[in-house]
Amino acid sequence: MVQRDARPPFAAIGGAVSPEFAALPTPCYLLDEAALTRNAEILGNLSRRTGCRVLLAQKAFRNYDLYPLLAPHLAGTEASGLFEARLGAEEMPSKEVHVFCAAYRADEMEELLQYADHIVFNSPAQLAKFGPAAKAAGKSVGLRINPECSTQDGHAIYDPCAPGSRLGTTRAQWDAAVAADPALPALLDGLHFHTLCEQDADALAVTLDAVADKFGDLLSKMQWLNFGGGHHITRPGYNMTTLERCIRRAHQDWGVTVYLEPGEACALNAGYLLTRVLDVVQNGDTTIAILDTSAACHMPDVIEMPYRPPLLGAGEPGEKACTVRLAGPTCLAGDVIGDYSFDAVPAVGDLLVFGDMAIYTTCKNNTFNGMPLPAIYARRPDGTTREITTFGYSNFKHRVGK
């Protein structure tokens, strides 16, 4: 029943289910090696053209078995804390490890200094508290800034520049901190901003203007400037020309090395979630297919963002003959993936394939309601598959006890 689908999430598989898919267990994440490599090559070519340094933001994708595909094209990894920093150091050895956290724990700092090369602090207070030790350990020290420039519509949960944001230091906060402690500027090697979410380079250009206006005098004294993440660099149609102009502007105006730390761009359209239909029920005019996967457990951003993930061969509601609501088997009434249309109602046992499932899935999933974690497989460039890991009852049990 699945027809050829030319949309970007499915282009790598020719827009159709291959025989290898049918043999895989469900639910199952299938990570596409060729698509990951293609994304990494785009990022690597950007680095070569502009001199910028690109990091993998592990918060979006940390399937380290596939790091060897990414590492040749990247400068290293970005971490949000101790565990991600350690993972980056272990799985991309000899590469840079950068870390940013809204607040660091004192009892973790000594170990963190073993793994991180760059440490970015969120506030002047944290910079004053931990910056001297980081400098003494030979680390490059940065401060996350808040340029107070929102470029997002409808995603306040992902807007670090929203009023009352806890993320980043405003210029007023910095000036007040320096007035109280004039030694703070000497601790800094670079500045970091992260204000985008799944955006094009025009939003970056607007943000960079704000950064220049509020922090330009500081940047001339810095070694590096980190543009953060949220850049959809590998998305078809992304404005690479504007991105490169922003990078070159930072080089020319302030003499800094530019870092980018995309997460989604590294693994965009490079994964699938395979699932089968368990039951089909009718409630009034609504046809509901209950799947062996769960939005709440296996693709939590569907509910958190929220958004409706692409589904191979399916149309928008009303586009095809039969509109069906796809939902999970948990007790959560809102465990709904979305409404899709098909030529015919999916039958029990039918295989469905969701696209763009490499990002914010395996790193965020959970076992609510006792839902098993999906197996993780990789798809080789020749179309064959290999098992990366599987999960069972012990994984569920041991998260809450010994």
Regions found by a protein language model. Give the residues of each.
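Active-site neighborhood of glycoside hydrolase catalytic domains
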Residues: 251
